[in-house]
Amino acid sequence: MSRSVWKGPFVDAYVLKKAAAVRESGRNEVIKIWSRRSTILPQFVGLTFGVYNGQKHIPVNVTEDMIGQKFGEYSPTRTYYGHAADKKAKRK
């Protein structure tokens, strides 16, 4: 179920503070965040966020297409190695 419209998008306060500080300084640096649940807002377009996936920070360059989605969607947490191959079939 999606979030109610009257509540507005959820963004952790520290993400807003860090984004405002980088915008104000004019530097193009990676903003490290741990909040995968925060929604991407229009004011984040053009910034680079390092979204934590449990092991490391994955750099995410925010574009206009990403507005309204969550940061966690762009930082996968699981590694897919493929299905195990059948060893008997490989030998033939």
UniProtKB/Swiss-Prot annotation:
Keywords, ordered alphabetically: Ribonucleoprotein, Ribosomal protein, RNA-binding, rRNA-binding
Residues that span the membrane, as ranges: none
GO CC terms: cytoplasm; small ribosomal subunit
PROSITE patterns: RIBOSOMAL_S19 (PS00323)
A GO term, aspect molecular function: rRNA binding
GO biological-process terms attached to the record: ribosomal small subunit assembly; translation
KW Ribosomal protein (keyword) present: yes
Record-linked NCBIfam families: rpsS_bact
Family in the record: Belongs to the universal ribosomal protein uS19 family.
Protein purpose: Protein S19 forms a complex with S13 that binds strongly to the 16S ribosomal RNA.
PANTHER family (alphabetical): RIBOSOMAL PROTEIN S19P FAMILY MEMBER, SMALL RIBOSOMAL SUBUNIT PROTEIN US19M
This protein's name: Small ribosomal subunit protein uS19
Species for this entry: Ruegeria pomeroyi (strain ATCC 700808 / DSM 15171 / DSS-3)
